[in-house]
């Protein structure tokens, strides 16, 4: 029971965040310095945004960099304000200088908002203490935060990685069960595919997250890390075999009518799903896996495959389920590979700076957008005669997310949560609760807020707002005066963030659909080249297969976000949704062909070359249709003719069947692209006649 309690992701996270906040407050209370203990609670907010609690092989180096940036921003803010430098100029300078961190890598990019938040917190402290005290608070607070989290992760043994792996296994279980419960509904892809696409998207996102965590811990050679690496390799093998499909609805229907294949296949899928859920709990709660057998289910599937040798569905399901059963039974990967062959080196500073100084740099545009929003927020504070507009600035910084949909959702949750929290705090302040009870209620509220933070940001904001009001009440006895101004500041900050997201160099996902579709086709082409090569090796095959899945996932995410964006052509998105559906079919065929190529089930060289040329022509036709507008107005561009595969004598092998279906899907995607292009917008990035002109 205690394992399920202490290792539960939400409980473990809430305990860690609450303790790192409240232990300094408790120490300050015992030493008679409650004020400094409460001020220490500002530092974990900056560290969380910077991702300094991420387990990493350079954990302490990142702590030193984070503490240095926090202290430097705090010092510059105080010194420049003392020299009467306007706040908009100060914030613009800090934002544009720190924006280069986004070019170094996604983890480094988190240092920009965290450092700006440290500067904004300094605005609230300036005038109440000497210049050196905020610097000391940030330095000691970051040191405490790092040491506590290092000790916590040392006790719980890679718990964040275990949580991600557990979620991955659980998502694979749901995906496997959902896929084969819709076995007889595959004749209607519009109904059967959307839920499967969502689950496939979640699984690939979790695989990417797990890989990043494995890479950040790659310097460790302890037994626990090696065990997690093996479990991750098993998950990759399971995803490879679960996400394949022949896409032969007619053959499926024939097999279902002639036998009880539907019940047997569903029996296998449910058994596999149940085992995956057990393994997910074992990973999360630090339990050793128990023995597992699936011989009866696999035997029944093998019997159906023998009874119907002319139907490829039975053979296909038996082969892939037997591989899944082997992984689950032996608890070992199907083959050896080097998962960390790609070292993912960060970009050196000088090349990153050169890339950042380009006007087409997304990092520069993001920094420019943020600097304008913060400048407008500070000017708004001046216009309203606010002595310090730090709450407006903080609101803008916290609600601004990567994309229109995420920002809009965060604005709604933040504004509603703040309003409710301020109302509750305003009522509670009238009761004049003693200090001891106040601190106890703040502790309980903080723990409850972190418990629900991951699932409901709005309700968590209610709790954080209440604790913020009482923190000000304990520090400066002005909690009641704080309520109405902070309510107005929150609304102003949310409006500024929304306006900046919509009007300041917006990065609409709808405008990236062409580029992402082009990149996905390029990944498919590289994968097919590797599969049809003379001697494909397991590690390059595994890497390319994941590139294919991630490229399609990026395209699918762009489509989902584009559907939430305002004032976009719904006809174009409907056509692109059908295009993405066929792209998913190709991904599943590539997953299946990867397993065949790894086991050296290759085609004859002449036939392989012929199929490779046909696939490349079909892919390039799709890319050209995405790149140019009309066949007659493409200038010197050559729109290629459709490939015509000559039928070969004898029954086509499994690999050849997959290739034929890939070519069929590509031809359909070319037709869809021709129809979708006529529905495209006629403004902004869409005025570019060629895709390569807009790739930046």
Segments (PLM) and residue ranges:
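Long, hydrophobic alpha-helical segments that serve as membrane-spanning/inserting helices
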Residues: 1-15, 22, 26, 30, ...
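N-terminal cofactor/phosphate-binding cores enriched in small/glycine residues
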Residues: 8, 12-83, 94-100, 115-120
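Alpha-helical membrane-inserting segments
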Residues: 23-31, 47-48, 72-80, 94-102, ...
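Structural signature of hydrophobic alpha-helical transmembrane segments
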Residues: 27-42, 76-93, 134-140, 380, ...
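Core alpha-helical transmembrane segments of integral membrane proteins
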Residues: 31-32, 346-447, 466
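C-terminal ends of transmembrane helices
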Residues: 45-57, 98-105, 399-407, 445-454
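Transmembrane helix-loop junctions at the membrane interface of multipass transporters and ion channels
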Residues: 110-134, 469-486
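Generic detector of multi-pass transmembrane helix bundles and their immediately adjacent loops
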Residues: 430-571, 580
